[in-house]
Amino acid sequence: MIFYLHGFDATSPGNHEKMRQLQFIDPDVRLVSYSTLHPKHDMQHLLKEVAKQMKHSDDPAPLMVGVGLGAYWAERIGFLNGLKSVLINPNLHPEDNMQGKIDRPEEYADIANKCVSQFREKNTHKAMCIFSVNDEMFDNQQLASELSAYYSIDWDDVQPHKFPQLAAHLPKIKAFKLA
């Protein structure tokens, strides 16, 4: 089973396409949608929804996959549920870069402060990251340097921020899920 968490643009048609591509790894791909506008509510909703979905699966190794803001949540919700996660062009600092886009971006900082201290050290090797060299939204070199001590980093020379084509990375994602 793969949980797919969309980015800030929840209605993008690319979400369906990415889910279809992920079905080459596992036919059971589930969209876990969230508002993107209310971080504290989103966190509670995502925790409950993932726990509920896991009860209805016999997969011994479910995987979280998130793009952009979805990767922010995939890392945290995956950690809290003991799941591996794939972070694609993760938005690591929504408290800074979501100003003007959501009502209370400061809630992300509050979530970070209330999360398990040094959770990345406790989550080492349980996530892999895929970054676009040509990401038009974030400085992925900087973000990769924040995560490289904890997770493996793969680079893509072609895809933009929303990462519409996962095909080149599906074998690595599958191997990571099954390892």
From Swiss-Prot:
S-S bridge residues: none
Top-level taxon of the source organism? Bacteria
Q: Extract the HAMAP family matched here.
A: UPF0227 (MF_01047)
Its name, as the record gives it, is UPF0227 protein Sbal195_2522
Q: Which InterPro entries match?
A: AB_hydrolase_fold, UPF0227, UPF0227/Esterase_YqiA
- Lineage of origin: Bacteria, Pseudomonadati, Pseudomonadota, Gammaproteobacteria, Alteromonadales
Q: Which family does it belong to?
A: Belongs to the UPF0227 family.
